[in-house]
Amino acid sequence: SDAGTYDIKVLGKGENFTDGRGHNETRFDAGGRYWAFADFKPTGGLNQVNKTEINVLGTPAKAIAYTQAKLSANVDGFSLSMDAGHDGTGFSSGTQQHIPVSIKQGGKAVDPATFENYLGEKAHLVMVEVASKEFVHTHPSVENGKLDIHTTFAKPGTYRGWLQFQTDGK
């Protein structure tokens, strides 16, 4: 089947490692083809991303086709809403995009400037293009009480994204 129809999910996150080795335990709920991304910065080096295909025995989950934009989410008591590009018409590839993200908790706006630093930043956004599995990692800035994502999509496509931030040690 088409690689672009496989579901893309965050299955687990490793921890900071100082000894050059890493460990991550992940439970796969279904068999099938998965991609693992290791995003790291060696001491004195530049950011690197290693991508590895993992084939898990068992019955694969039903493939999911992403055909509709989803620019909002409710997770752990927070509501997030992403603006559809700078002019509200969508995103473009090949040019710098500024994408504001509004965050609420209990219906009230949350200023991301109040977030704790997590791995040295107020937030991390990881996006993966569904068909090519292109990996994008960016650190949104805090502007006007919102997170502002500054990124360039190299190619047109459907991207799935995960935003990480920390409040109250979580």
Predicted features along the sequence, with ranges:
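N-terminal soluble domains immediately following signal/targeting peptides that reside
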Residues: 1-170
